[in-house]
């Protein structure tokens, strides 16, 4: 239970946020809680956080990420895109092992959280290792398939869809195109 803090919903207001289990069950001023509990219920919380003087607001969402690429940030970023990809990115990515993408994704997730990013849309190579980083950290992600010239068969995409959507309530999978320069068919 969190009381007496500023909340950024539409307008700044004083209010409360209640969490039951891993779901937000109430946001409001604390007077009309009938949707959450009966009037004569005694509510006992595991903990109450006094956040007076703080601001509670929704987390940011990053809608286009390749999370394990944190290791290439600012690496030869003065090159034109195709030159950067062909000469710098792809050769370095080719040296990665599955476990590397797992730990690089963990690093990226930690960076997201320190920046207020609470969910993302992501795509990257070696997705089984990569997606496990999201499941293990409990970070909300929508993993996209990266349809392109290198894409597996539609059957494999369907298997991935069924498998990844069943891993966690916080993890989902949708088809998505990677980029115009990796897809030759219209």
Where would I find each of the regions flagged by the language model?
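Divalent metal-coordination and catalytic microenvironments
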Residues: 17, 22, 53, 64, ...
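Metal-coordinating catalytic core of metallo-dependent amide/deamination hydrolases
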Residues: 130-186
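Short acidic/polar active-site loop segments enriched in Thr and Asp
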Residues: 118-119, 140
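Short, small-residue-biased leader/transition segments that mark boundaries at the very start
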Residues: 2-9
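Active-site gating loops and adjacent loop-to-helix segments of metal-dependent hydrolytic enzymes
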Residues: 71-103, 137-145, 165
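Histidine-rich, glycine-flanked metal-binding segment
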Residues: 10-57
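Short, acidic/polar
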Residues: 97-109, 124-127, 152-161
């Amino acid at each position: 239970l969190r009381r007496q803090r500023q909340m950024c919903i539409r307008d700044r207001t004083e209010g409360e946020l209640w969490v039951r289990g891993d779901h937000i069950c109430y946001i409001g001023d604390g007077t009309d809680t009938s949707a959450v509990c009966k009037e004569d219920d005694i509510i006992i919380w595991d903990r109450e956080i006094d956040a007076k003087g703080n601001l509670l607001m929704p987390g940011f969402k990053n809608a286009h990420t390749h999370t394990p690429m944190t290791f290439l940030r600012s690496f030869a970023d003065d090159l034109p895109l195709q030159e950067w990809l062909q000469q710098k990115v792809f050769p370095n990515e080719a040296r990665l092992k599955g476990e590397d993408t797992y730990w690089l994704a963990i690093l990226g997730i930690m960076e997201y959280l320190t920046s207020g990013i609470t969910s993302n849309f992501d795509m990257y190579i070696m997705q089984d290792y990569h997606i496990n980083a999201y499941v293990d950290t409990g970070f909300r992600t929508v993993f996209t398939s990266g349809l392109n010239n290198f894409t597996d068969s539609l059957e494999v995409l369907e298997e991935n869809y069924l498998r990844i959507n069943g891993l966690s309530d916080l993890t989902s999978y949708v088809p998505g195109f990677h980029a115009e320069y990796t897809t030759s068919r219209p």
